Amino acid sequence: MEKFAPEFHGEDANNKATKFLESIKGKFASSKDPKKKDSIISVNSIDIEVTKESPITSGTNIINPTSEADSTPETKANYPRKPLVSFKEDLTPSDNPFSKLYKETIETFDNNEEESSYSYEEINDQTNDNITARLDRIDEKLSEILGMLHTLVVASAGPTSARDGIRDAMVGLREEMIEKIRAEALMTNDRLEAMARLRNEESEKMAKDTSDEVPLNPTSKKLSDLLEDNDSDNDLSLDDF
């Protein structure tokens, strides 16, 4: 027959429980120092008790924002306009006969104060494509002349025989280029004058023609009469067209 633990009921069970709690009271006494205060950290609604000996620490890292450079328009440097053609070599030696010519040419072709004589409409008009192309060719030829002058400046520092030969050849080419540029400029001016005359003529015609009537050719007149009379005898034949 199996043995079971004794059962206690009523006052007897209460006395037994009291004696058991008094017997184990000294075994689980707290060893914490009463002077040290504990802190309670609540994490996700769960209370965690942390003593002062806990290695849990907290710190804050302060990041200093870097000061950006002042980029106001007043502090920005104004860079000068670069010339159309520039060279790295020193082109102004005192004993060079072509340095003055080269300098004057650069100043003539790279004057910031000069503006184009063509208006915005003339430059962007589709009918002026040929004129724009001519101006582009003139610009290219002017750049070639600057290159020739630069070659003259560099060649002037070489031997006498080579210098004289290059000088004669380059001077001749320069004269030819100048003549071609003059011819292109004259043709461009003539074309602009012709366009101006046509524009003035059209403006005069539009100013004189103030009526709303449109002239009709013979076929249009027959069609108009047919619609006005509404007569079947005035039908048009293929010969009328």
Curated annotation (Swiss-Prot):
Residues 232-241 are annotated as: Binding to the N-RNA complex. Residues 226-241 have a biased composition (Acidic residues). Residues 39-57 are annotated as: Important for viral particle assembly. Residues 200-211 have a biased composition (Basic and acidic residues). Keywords: Host cytoplasm, Host-virus interaction, Inhibition of host NF-kappa-B by virus, Phosphoprotein, Viral RNA replication, Virion. Belongs to the pneumoviridae phosphoprotein P family. Plays critical roles in regulating RNA replication and transcription through its interactions with multiple proteins. Tethers the RNA-directed RNA polymerase L to the nucleoprotein-RNA complex. Recruits the M2-1 protein, a processivity factor that is required for efficient transcription of viral RNA. Acts as a chaperone for neo-synthesized nucleoprotein by forming an N-P complex that preserves N in a monomeric and RNA-free state and prevents the association of nascent N with host cell RNAs. Recruits the host phosphatase PP1 to inclusion bodies to regulate viral transcription. The keyword Thylakoid does not apply. Constitutively phosphorylated by host. Phosphorylation at S-116, S-117, S-119, S-232 and S-237 is required for transcription inhibition by M2-2 and viral particle egress. Phosphorylation at S-232 and S-237 increases the affinity of the binding to the nucleoprotein. One of its GO terms (molecular function) is RNA-directed RNA polymerase activity. Residues 120-160 are annotated as: Oligomerization and binding to RNA-directed RNA polymerase L. The gene is P. Its main location: virion. Residues 216-232 are annotated as: Binding to RNA-directed RNA polymerase L. The keyword Phosphoprotein applies. The N-terminus is important for viral particle assembly. The oligomerization region is central. The C-terminus part contains binding regions for the RNA-directed RNA polymerase L and the nucleoprotein. InterPro entries: EF_Hand_1_Ca_BS, Pprotein_pneumovir. It is found in: Virion; Host cytoplasm. This is Phosphoprotein. Residues 1-30 are annotated as: Binding to monomeric RNA-free nucleoprotein. It comes from Human respiratory syncytial virus B (strain B1). The modification Phosphothreonine is found at T108. Residues 54-75 have a biased composition (Polar residues). Disulfide bonds: none annotated. It holds the Pfam family Pneumo_phosprot. Homotetramer. Interacts with protein M2-1; the interaction between the two tetramers is required for the anti-termination and elongation transcriptional activities of protein M2-1. Interacts with host phosphatase PP1; this interaction recruits PP1 to the inclusion bodies. Formation of a complex PP1/M2-1/P allows P to target host PP1 phosphatase to the M2-1 substrate. Interacts (via C-terminus) with the nucleoprotein N (via N-terminus); the phosphorylated phosphoprotein P binds to N-RNA complex. Interacts (via N-terminus) with the monomeric RNA-free nucleoprotein N.
